[in-house]
Amino acid sequence: MNDTQDFISAQAAVLRQVGGPLAVEPVRISMPKGDEVLIRIAGVGVCHTDLVCRDGFPVPLPIVLGHEGSGTVEAVGEQVRTLKPGDRVVLSFNSCGHCGNCHDGHPSNCLQMLPLNFGGAQRVDGGQVLDGAGHPVQSMFFGQSSFGTHAVAREINAVKVGDDLPLELLGPLGCGIQTGAGAAINSLGIGPGQSLAIFGGGGVGLSALLGARAVGADRVVVIEPNAARRALALELGASHALDPHAEGDLVAAIKAATGGGATHSLDTTGLPPVIGSAIACTLPGGTVGMVGLPAPDAPVPATLLDLLSKSVTLRPITEGDADPQRFIPRMLDFHRAGKFPFDRLITRYRFDQINEALHATEKGEAIKPVLVF
């Protein structure tokens, strides 16, 4: 550690034990070095991944979670070339920037994806966050740890944006919204004349709907048990919104809605029976995208013969196969054109309501909570 570090004072929501509440505490954050940037957070989305890590997915404790931040650059390290103080940015996932996948424009498949985003990646030159007692707190969750008034990210995962949209609402573009829209556009390649069946009408599923409609998909069917979310899906452009519990034969209903079967389908639940329905409703030659987090021992709900005979591809998807530096500006352009109203998914919370926002996410009471500072 560099003993001559300068620090700023901030507030951050710290998780100290598995399953525990997040406590807003005073912290000190060392100034950025190298390719790092210090961000004053304007808003940060709450994602199911935050819940998963709170509840036991292995991350180093104590930790500051949060990985859908947006804000203003306050300081930069000496190696930063594309950002300066005053720039408005959306923060996304971390990547190494130099492996083959990163070099080829696929940072979501970075060979260091797990350690850089979940594994306690270290800051440059021993930089750190200290709690009120002077003890270190892990602070590079998804390269940002943005559940706080300030965060340190890297130049590679800070995307500069314009000043024409509410900065505090843009953070979810860096993960949840990017995951859904990118799954439809980048991974499945949805376009005019094609159809898509989306299983789950949460933030990721409805973002996939927005992405599919933005690029001209013909029919988009959302399968969701919550009546309010089905209604919202129809308002956002779904051709059909089906209640899986009310359909006697769900696969038949999807095939009827799509004129014989969906070109592609997308599962956001991670549940094997649901993925089985996605496979069954997809036309031969189509792709079943999978973004939902399954249980560790969840089986694939199809035999190899099923997949071979139907010629359906199972496609696991991380972060919408997106390069955030390119895809976040594309989503914003869709929004400016009136084709991507992602703000319809957002519910605002104050930062001191963080545990309420986490609860609302867990119970499905809010589609995309955003903590506003």
Swiss-Prot record:
Its biological purpose: Involved in the degradation of the monoterpenes beta-myrcene and limonene. During anaerobic degradation of beta-myrcene, catalyzes the NAD(+)-dependent oxidation of geraniol to geranial. Can also catalyze the oxidation of (S)-perillyl alcohol to perillyl aldehyde, and to a lesser extent, the oxidation of nerol, citronellol, cumic alcohol, and benzyl alcohol. Cannot use NADP(+) instead of NAD(+) as cosubstrate.
PROSITE patterns documented for this protein: ADH_ZINC
Q: Which gene does this sequence derive from?
A: geoA
Reaction catalysed by this chain? (2E)-geraniol + NAD(+) = (2E)-geranial + NADH + H(+); perillyl alcohol + NAD(+) = perillyl aldehyde + NADH + H(+)
Activity regulation reads:
Is inhibited by EDTA, N-ethylmaleimide, diethylpyrocarbonate, and 1-cyclohexyl-N-(2-morpholinoethyl)carbodiimide in vitro.
Question: What is this enzyme's EC?
Answer: 1.1.1.347, 1.1.1.144
Cofactor dependence? Zn(2+)
Q: What induces it?
A: By the monoterpenes limonene and alpha-phellandrene.
Q: Name one GO biological process term.
A: monoterpenoid metabolic process
> What's the protein called, per UniProt?
Geraniol dehydrogenase
Q: Its family?
A: Belongs to the zinc-containing alcohol dehydrogenase family.
Q: Which GO terms describe its molecular function?
A: alcohol dehydrogenase (NAD+) activity; NAD binding; perillyl-alcohol dehydrogenase (NAD+) activity; protein homodimerization activity; zinc ion binding
Q: Is Oxidoreductase one of the keywords UniProt gives this record?
A: yes
Instruction: Print the organism lineage.
Output: Bacteria, Pseudomonadati, Pseudomonadota, Betaproteobacteria, Burkholderiales
Enzyme kind, highest EC tier: oxidoreductase
**Binding, Zn(2+) 1:** C47, H67, C175
Q: Which organism is it from?
A: Castellaniella defragrans (strain DSM 12143 / CCUG 39792 / 65Phen) (Alcaligenes defragrans)
Q: Which residues form the signal peptide?
A: none
> How does it associate, per the subunit comment?
Homodimer.
Gene3D superfamilies associated with the record: Medium-chain alcohol dehydrogenases, catalytic domain, NAD(P)-binding Rossmann-like Domain
CDD domains per record = benzyl_alcohol_DH
Pathway info? Terpene metabolism; monoterpene degradation
Q: Which UniProt keywords apply?
A: Metal-binding, NAD, Oxidoreductase, Zinc
Tell me yes or no: is tRNA-binding among this UniProt entry's keywords: no
Q: How is the cofactor bound?
A: Binds 2 Zn(2+) ions per subunit.
Q: Which residues bind Zn(2+) 2?
A: C96, C99, C102, C110
What does the free-text pH dependence field read?
Optimum pH is 9.4.
